């Protein structure tokens, strides 16, 4: 039943009666309609008056019905319409749904005359189609839009086409130039006592029947006007013939959408319709059927949908403004029946009339709304507020693009600011700390209007401090919150709070009286809400007033420290008071004076930004003494002042003692002038010699034409044969840039290299600071076949760099890695590394994961002889880590650095930490980087222990205690006890001001130990995490981090002048005539003068050479012994314990090449170097430079580290840079027994093994060849025992042999396995031991964890001999007799375990001992 469809709970009799009365009314008016048509749309006066009278009465019934009647009016007065429950949060259509309009029920429910049906068809509707379920769901899922837009569109629109319906109001209107409209009443409100209809519909909330042109589809969804924007004109519908076919066709046509039309128009062809027009309508409806479903809705949600109420005042205000506009549009819409404008015989199109009458602004609003995506059916109040305000703020735009793109960000920001500011006030009032944190995190202080008072004259900080909410107040203070400017005094604050309390009480009293009087009206619920809100606000204001009355002034700040930070600046740091006396401190005052009693202030500073409790006083007079004090402030006023510690200070700097200037002053300007002179010289000499620059390139192209005959373009190198290459590593996070052949971009420099490779490499590193000038250098460089080999090799480097730039499409190739990579095939790889901000698309490259690239490369590599490219991929993680860490800078402060060098054949290396390779080993002294004049004079005056005692008693010099702490920390970092550092010195010639407010004091070793020569013994072994970096590379990365502009200019000048010196020298040699000789000599002299000027500037800035000069002096010149600062007798001397595998250089250093360096002798192990026995562990070198001088960061680590660190290292090493090809299984000899070869030799570790309770004295270390059948050759140490695992074998014994199930860190040493490792230390037990079986002491380490110190992890291997007994005495005897004991090398100082020297000659070392060294390296 149709009546049951719209009102399922209404009885059918009442609806049927309404239909019959509607039919009677329509038949009476039918003759008038025909007369209007015959009279060319000129109505008769009586009929016109009759229609207008009926429309006027209907409008009067809507507008003037009293509130007390059973049918409340649609539009209330200004005071009444806001009192409807939920009106503040619901839309206008929900307000309209409260109206019944029972007086217009008959007119609304009259049957349609357009498509007459039988009585049965009038009272029934077809069931809802399943095809439109998706469309209905989409329509309901769309977010409800602004109701004002919908109503405004209803006001401006013309007639819409409606499908045939059994309930269709008919209104004939005469022709008029001004169109009129009418709005019919909804269906009567359903009665709950009535039965349900027979049609089954989906259970979903629907909008009640209400005026405004709403339509319903078969499933109960509301159809908005704009959903029918492309429907055909009304005249086409009116021309349906009255036949039986219409009864069957129309229900099928409108099965998806059964609308209810409330306003229609009719023209002269109301009762005439032809079959042609019928079919045109059907075809047009079928074409637009899907299009109608996809248009976004502009209507409002139903009254039964639940909405989240907004408690915000600004939200309610915005909605009321929106309601006023909607009501105004609605009132304008209640007019007499509208008449269509146009000539007779033409139907008015919806699109034509709508586009004419709708303003440009409304078009933009409609387009903007139609672009919005689907959202929840019931948005929150914040979202509705956002939509309402965004449309009001948008204004008029010329086009949709302007409205949507250009104005959208401003509107969103403005609306967001209003919402966030209001939300912040509510969160502070409700004491919601989480909400305040979220708002402060998402918005800035300006966006929140953090310091803008609200209507009550309060800021969020005022509310938080007067309610004594300390956490929220501190958050607001850190965000930059301030108090209200209205509170100029205590009296004004008190009066303001009292006024707020009185106002809240008055409003609460008035609302209470209104609620009592109007307890039965509709306004009661809203009044009660307002009453509760004002009562709560009254309590809030009373609490704020009570908090203000009980608060007191704050106490003095704590820990006020005064420091000298420059020649004209002082810095004060402090902490907040211990007790704030029930009030949060909002600001501090810093005062300084030249008088101790502060009777005359030199200045003061108010600190309101409390993010950092630190203040810097600038503009002071150098050399004048200043006293400083600090006081705190809260809402009750200023508290007492606190003097600083020390109470006074003199602005000064350490350079004020002798008047020296800074190292970097004026050097940058001088280098810029020198660079301009060099460029001018190049232009002068290159202008006349252009022909010489073209001939070599032409000859080169001819000579290389045959080689590149079948190569159309230059490409990357796929495989290394022999020569020098440049590899460019571009990375982003864990991805590398590779070529289309999945290779790292590599180009060839030359097919061979000379003995000056190291000098060429250093020049290439300088070239990395001027990649953009490569083309200019190539053009100005004229190289002939008679040129020197150095000049030719550098010209080839320039050509290769330019080629790589062209292939990659970028000038910047990155920084050069600190050493080249070499292999046994005669290849040298120069690596440049650059970090990319994103995965930038390259024309000749793509991005690939590092792990994937390594796994692909391992299948192609040669197991016996790894190439330089293989070594690059193996150590790629270390290279990238070095690149990242070398760009980090230290924070501002004063540091204590440790200067230690080691020399090799052709270079000097500096000890640096791996975590920061651009700086010496260091520890922080303090945050203040400046050293004052008084502190520097105190350091210079130290001349003996008497001075130390005097300085120790003096409380004024804080630098003394800071230096003591820093020295102990640095010595502990390098694993050196105090008694062994008694010869160390403090460098006092200068304070190294490195830049970026970072300064250094240097700690120097003894004069003989400053630089360790090759073969020199190591007095101590530092902790892991250090590397030896070449001095030139250290200076490059150091200055690139701290003096970027200086090093860039220096590298430009140095690289250009080096080339110019070679060119002018070659020209001078080739000169024949006197004029040529004179010109060449003059030019060469100019270049030499430039080089001399550059070297002078470089020496002034190069601080490390000056420090080395003073460090080698044995006389106390420029340094102070640390024994005058630190008492070395505090720690008793302890003898350290070493092992044979700790006989390495000073520290392990990383290297991209997997080569093992020579075993250096130590005092306790070997008296001489093992040149013959260790010759096989080196890769042969073709020049005097060998990359094996600097080992990999995964090198020997013989000092203690925790189990967590070791396990982390193991995971990182084996899963990071090294692919699976590097993870070996076993270490076996090919001449061993078959059982040994077939059985895997597992490697176990002993963690936290303590040997302090024993006296380990190993006088002889028997070789493992005693239990081997035959000692193998030195070149056959690794065996391919596992057929499924590929690895590098042969002489490359730097690969760590690992078990597949056990993967410890590669940086840990491997030792001779004990025969009975599983033996407990208390209970004797003897068990047979297999040569291929190993055991661990892990189960017995827990009882001794607390009583015995920790020793680093030790690897043990099995042996053929078993211990006869496992009790502790026999074990000690075995250890004393020299049986296979595990020597705990690198034990921490203070342990009682010792070891005597082992005199093992190089010839007596067996292959098994060599394998220990090899397996302990990377």
UniProtKB/Swiss-Prot annotation:
Compositionally biased region (Low complexity): 171-186
Lineage, top ranks: Eukaryota, Metazoa, Chordata, Craniata, Vertebrata
ANK repeat residue intervals: 419-450, 456-485
Protein name: Ankyrin repeat and fibronectin type-III domain-containing protein 1
Entries under SUPFAM superfamilies matching the protein: Ankyrin repeat, Fibronectin type III
Reported function: Required for vestibular-related functions.
Keyword annotations: ANK repeat, Repeat
Region (Highly conserved peptide sequence) residue spans: 893-900
Keyword Amino-acid biosynthesis: no
Polar residues: bias regions: 144-154, 1136-1146, 1407-1418
Knockout-associated phenotype: Inactivation of ankfn1 produces vestibular defects in fish larvae.
An annotated GO cellular component: spindle
InterPro entries the UniProt entry points to: ANKFN1, Ankyrin_rpt, Ankyrin_rpt-contain_sf, FN3_dom, FN3_sf, Ig-like_fold
GO biological process, one term: establishment of mitotic spindle orientation
């Amino acid at each position: 039943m149709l009546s049951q469809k719209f009102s399922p709970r209404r009885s059918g009799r009442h609806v049927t009666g309404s239909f019959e009365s509607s039919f009677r009314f329509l038949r009476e008016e039918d003759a008038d309609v025909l007369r209007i048509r015959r009279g060319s749309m000129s109505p008769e006066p009586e009929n016109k008056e009759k229609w207008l009278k009926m429309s006027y009465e209907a409008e009067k019934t809507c507008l003037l019905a009293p509130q007390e009647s059973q049918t409340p009016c649609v539009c209330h007065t200004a005071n009444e319409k806001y009192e409807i429950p939920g009106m503040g949060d619901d839309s206008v259509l929900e307000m309209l749904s409260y109206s019944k309009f029972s007086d217009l029920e008959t007119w609304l429910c009259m049957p349609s005359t357009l498509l007459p049906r039988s009585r049965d068809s009038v009272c029934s509707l077809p069931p809802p189609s399943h095809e439109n379920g998706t469309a209905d769901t989409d329509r309901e899922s769309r977010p409800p839009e602004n109701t004002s837009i919908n109503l405004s569109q209803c006001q401006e629109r013309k007639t819409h086409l409606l499908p045939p319906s059994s309930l269709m109001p008919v209104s004939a209107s005469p022709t008029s130039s001004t169109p009129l409209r009418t709005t019919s009443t909804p269906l009567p409100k359903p009665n709950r006592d009535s039965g349900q209809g027979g049609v089954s519909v989906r259970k979903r909330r629907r909008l009640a029947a209400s005026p405004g042109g709403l339509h319903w589809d078969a499933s109960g969804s509301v159809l908005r006007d704009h959903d029918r924007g492309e429907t055909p004109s009304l005249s086409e519908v009116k021309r349906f013939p009255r036949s039986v076919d219409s009864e069957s066709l129309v229900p099928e046509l409108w099965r998806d959408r059964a609308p209810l039309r409330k306003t229609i128009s009719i023209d002269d062809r109301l009762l005439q319709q032809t079959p042609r027009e019928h079919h045109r309508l059907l075809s047009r409806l079928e074409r637009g059927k899907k299009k109608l479903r996809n248009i976004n809705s502009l209507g409002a949600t139903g009254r039964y949908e639940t909405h989240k109420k907004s408690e915000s005042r600004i939200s309610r205000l915005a909605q009321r403004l929106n309601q006023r506009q909607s009501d105004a549009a609605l009132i304008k819409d209640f007019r007499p029946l509208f008449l269509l404008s146009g000539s007779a015989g033409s139907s008015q199109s919806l699109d034509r009339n709508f586009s004419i009458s709708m303003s440009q602004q409304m078009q933009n609003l409609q387009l903007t709304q139609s672009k919005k995506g689907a959202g929840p059916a019931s948005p929150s109040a914040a979202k509705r507020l956002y939509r309402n305000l965004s449309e009001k703020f948008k204004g008029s735009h010329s086009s949709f693009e302007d409205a949507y793109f250009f104005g959208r960000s401003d509107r969103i920001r403005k609306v967001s600011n209003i919402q966030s500011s209001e939300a912040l006030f509510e969160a502070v009032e409700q004491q919601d700390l989480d909400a305040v944190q979220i708002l402060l995190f998402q918005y800035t202080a300006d966006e929140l209007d953090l310091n803008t008072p609200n209507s009550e004259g309060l800021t969020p900080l005022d509310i938080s401090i007067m309610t004594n909410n300390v956490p929220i107040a501190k958050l607001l203070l850190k965000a930059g919150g301030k108090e209200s400017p209205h509170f100029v005094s205590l009296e004004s604050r008190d009066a303001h709070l009292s006024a707020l309390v009185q106002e809240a009480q008055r409003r609460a009293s008035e609302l209470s009286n209104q609620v009592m009087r109007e307890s039965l009206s509709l306004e009661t619920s809203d009044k009660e809400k307002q009453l509760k809100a004002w009562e709560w606000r009254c309590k809030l204001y009373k609490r704020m007033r009570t908090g203000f009355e009980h608060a007191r002034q704050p106490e003095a700040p704590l820990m006020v420290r005064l420091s000298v930070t420059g020649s004209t600046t002082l810095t004060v740091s402090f902490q907040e008071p211990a007790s704030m006396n029930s009030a949060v401190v909002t600001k501090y005052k810093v005062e300084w004076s030249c008088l101790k009693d502060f009777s005359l202030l030199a200045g003061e500073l108010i600190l309101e930004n409390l993010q950092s409790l630190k203040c810097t006083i600038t503009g002071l007079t150098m050399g004048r003494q200043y006293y400083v004090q600090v006081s705190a402030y809260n809402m009750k006023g200023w508290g007492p002042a606190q003097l600083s510690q020390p109470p006074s200070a003199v602005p000064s700097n350490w350079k004020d003692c002798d008047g020296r200037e800074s190292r970097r002053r004026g050097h940058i300007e001088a280098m810029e002038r020198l660079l301009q002179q060099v460029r001018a010289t190049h232009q002068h000499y290159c202008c006349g010699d252009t022909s010489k620059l073209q001939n070599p390139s032409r000859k080169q192209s001819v000579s290389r034409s045959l080689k590149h005959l079948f190569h159309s373009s230059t490409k990357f190198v796929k495989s290394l044969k022999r020569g020098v290459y440049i590899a460019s590593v571009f990375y982003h996070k864990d991805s590398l840039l590779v070529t289309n052949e999945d290779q790292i971009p590599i180009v060839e420099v030359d097919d061979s290299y000379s003995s000056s490779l190291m000098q060429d490499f250093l020049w290439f590193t300088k070239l990395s600071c001027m990649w953009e000038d490569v083309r200019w250098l190539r053009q100005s460089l004229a190289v002939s076949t008679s040129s020197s080999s150095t000049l030719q090799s550098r010209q080839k480097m320039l050509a290769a760099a330019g080629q790589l730039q062209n292939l990659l499409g970028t000038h910047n190739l990155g920084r050069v890695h600190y050493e080249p990579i070499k292999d046994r095939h005669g290849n040298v790889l120069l690596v440049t590394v650059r970090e990319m901000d994103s995965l930038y698309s390259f024309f000749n490259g793509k991005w690939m994961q590092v792990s994937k690239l390594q796994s692909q490369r391992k299948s192609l590599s040669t197991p016996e002889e790894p190439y330089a490219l293989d070594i690059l991929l193996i150590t790629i993680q270390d290279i990238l880590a070095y690149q990242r860490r070398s760009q980090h800078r230290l924070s501002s402060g004063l540091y204590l650095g440790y200067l230690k060098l080691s020399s090799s054949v052709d270079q000097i290396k500096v000890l640096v930490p791996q975590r920061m390779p651009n700086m010496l080993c260091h520890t922080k002294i303090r945050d203040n980087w400046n050293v004052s004049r008084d502190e520097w004079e105190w350091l210079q005056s130290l001349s003996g222990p008497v001075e130390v005692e005097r300085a120790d008693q003096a409380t004024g010099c804080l630098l003394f205690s800071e230096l003591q702490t820093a020295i102990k920390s640095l010595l502990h970092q390098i694993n050196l006890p105090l008694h062994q550092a008694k010869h160390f010195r403090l460098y006092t010639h200068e304070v190294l001001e490195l830049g970026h407010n970072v300064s250094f004091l240097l700690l120097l070793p003894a004069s003989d130990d400053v630089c360790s020569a090759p073969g020199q013994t190591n007095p101590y072994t530092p902790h892991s995490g250090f590397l030896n970096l070449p001095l030139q590379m250290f200076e490059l990365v150091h200055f690139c981090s701290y003096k970027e502009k200086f090093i860039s200019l220096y590298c430009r000048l140095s690289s250009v002048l080096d080339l110019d010196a070679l060119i002018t020298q070659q020209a001078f040699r080739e000169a024949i005539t006197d004029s040529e000789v004179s010109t060449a000599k003059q030019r060469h002299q100019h270049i030499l003068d430039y080089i001399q000027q550059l070297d002078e500037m470089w020496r002034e800035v190069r601080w490390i050479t000056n420090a080395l000069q003073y460090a080698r002096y044995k006389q106390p010149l420029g340094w102070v012994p640390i024994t005058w600062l630190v008492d070395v007798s505090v720690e008793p001397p302890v003898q350290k314990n070493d092992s044979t595998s700790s006989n390495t250089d000073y520290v392990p250093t990383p290297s991209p090449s997997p080569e093992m360096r020579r075993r250096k002798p130590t005092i306790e192990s070997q008296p001489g170097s093992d040149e013959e026995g260790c010759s096989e562990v080196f890769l042969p070198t073709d020049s005097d430079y060998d990359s094996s001088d600097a080992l990999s960061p995964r090198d020997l680590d013989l000092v203690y580290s925790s189990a967590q660190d070791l396990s982390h290292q193991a995971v990182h090493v084996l899963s990071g840079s090294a692919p699976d090809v590097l993870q070996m299984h076993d270490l076996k000899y090919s001449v061993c027994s078959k059982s040994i070869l077939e059985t895997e030799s597992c490697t176990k570790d002993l963690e936290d093994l303590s040997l302090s309770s024993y006296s380990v004295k190993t006088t002889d270390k028997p070789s493992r060849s005693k239990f081997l059948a035959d000692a193998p050759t030195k070149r056959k140490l690794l065996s391919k025992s596992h057929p499924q695992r590929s690895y590098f074998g042969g002489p490359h014994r730097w690969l760590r042999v690992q078990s597949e199930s056990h993967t410890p860190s590669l940086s840990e040493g491997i030792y001779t396995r004990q025969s009975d490792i599983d033996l407990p230390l208390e209970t004797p037990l003897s068990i047979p031991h297999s040569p291929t079986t190993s055991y661990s002491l892990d189960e017995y380490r827990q009882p001794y964890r607390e009583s015995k110190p920790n020793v680093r992890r030790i690897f043990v291997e099995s042996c053929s001999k078993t211990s006869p007994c496992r009790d502790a005495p026999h074990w000690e005897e075995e250890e004393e007799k020299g049986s296979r004991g595990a020597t705990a090398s690198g034990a921490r100082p203070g342990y009682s375990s010792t070891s005597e020297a082992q005199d093992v000659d190089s010839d007596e070392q067996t292959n098994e001992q060599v394998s220990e060294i090899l397996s302990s390296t990377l």
